A protein has these predicted regions:
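Hydrophobic structural packing positions in well-ordered secondary structure
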Residues: 5, 25, 51, 74, ...
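An alpha-beta-alpha
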Residues: 147-182
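Alpha-helical recognition/docking segments in bacterial nutrient-uptake
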Residues: 57-145
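Hydrophobic alpha-helical
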Residues: 107-110, 173-249
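Hydrophobic alpha-helical segments within soluble ligand-binding/sensing domains
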Residues: 136-161, 222-244
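N-terminal helix-turn-helix DNA-binding module of bacterial transcription factors
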Residues: 1-44
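Structural motif
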Residues: 54-57, 90, 104-108, 128, ...
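Short beta-strand segments enriched in small/hydrophobic residues
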Residues: 6, 43-60, 157-163
Length: 249
């Protein structure tokens, strides 16, 4: 029946369908090269499967490269989770009707609230501290990074090297965690790079000083962090009540 085909296409598990029938329908779907219409699915589920990303346009080429690396990685990750990514810079703070959830990347607190005031979709802050129990915020665990660096270098003397950071509380937390910090704005600043031990979380910096003999690279957006982002997207889009909205990875 039409209903049976619909159940199989939409992966309904609450209906009793024999394996033989399911396999036959899937074979025919494959032969016809059928893919479900996204608009039709949205009408049924009330979800667009679109995630919007708001980010502050980078000033330096290094930051632009790092943003692009993150966006590419996030796009591929969300695609594997059946989500699509929409990217917007800070110049486009407006109502976004299409998105199930809005992510922000390293934006200032005041800009975060501007985005929130313009939208009804749930907001999730990445790499910034909003400290508002209404919103999820997902950040790196700098104390954990410090412990990993001490274990790796075998001593407490090392320098945390990073691209410039917009969020003030995140910068303050880094300042209180690491005794030696170097922010890199341009490639030229790496010409006289002579630090003994270096901890890096930015992909572009890891590539630029890839031959540096005493370096520890721990991605600021690990697979674990992406999974936490996805979990927060699911919780937020489904309006599931969670006690802890402050996630550190």
């Amino acid at each position: 029946s039409v209903a049976t085909v619909s159940y199989i296409i939409n992966n309904r598990e609450d209906q009793k369908i024999s394996p033989e029938t399911r396999n036959k329908v899937l074979q025919i779907i494959n032969l016809l090269d059928y893919t479900p219409n996204q608009a039709a699915k949205s009408l049924v589920t009330q979800k667009s499967q679109i995630v919007a990303l708001h980010y502050k346009e980078a000033e330096s080429y290094l930051q632009k490269a790092e943003q692009l690396h993150f966006i590419n990685k996030l796009t591929n990750f969300l695609h594997n989770k059946n989500y699509y990514l929409m990217c917007l810079s800070e110049h486009y703070i407006e109502k976004i009707d299409l998105a199930d959830v809005i992510l922000t990347l390293d934006v200032a607190k005041e800009d975060f609230y501007k985005i929130g005031n313009a939208n009804f979709s749930p907001l999730i802050a990445l790499d910034s501290f909003i400290d508002d129990p209404v919103f999820f915020q997902i950040n790196s665990d700098f104390q954990k990074l410090k412990k990993q660096a001490i274990q790796y270098f075998g001593e407490t003397t090392f320098t945390f090297v990073s691209l410039p950071i917009n969020d003030e509380k995140r910068k303050e937390l880094i300042q209180n965690t690491f005794s030696s910090i170097k922010y890199v704005k341009s490639v030229e600043e790496l010409d006289n790079f002579d630090y003994k031990n270096v901890l890096i979380i930015d992909s572009i910096l890891e590539q630029l000083i890839s031959n540096y003999y005493n370096k520890l690279y721990i991605s600021g957006f690990s697979d674990e962090k992406f999974e936490k982002i996805f979990q927060a997207i699911e919780w937020a889009s489904q309006r599931i009540e969670i006690n802890n909205h402050n996630i550190v990875v």
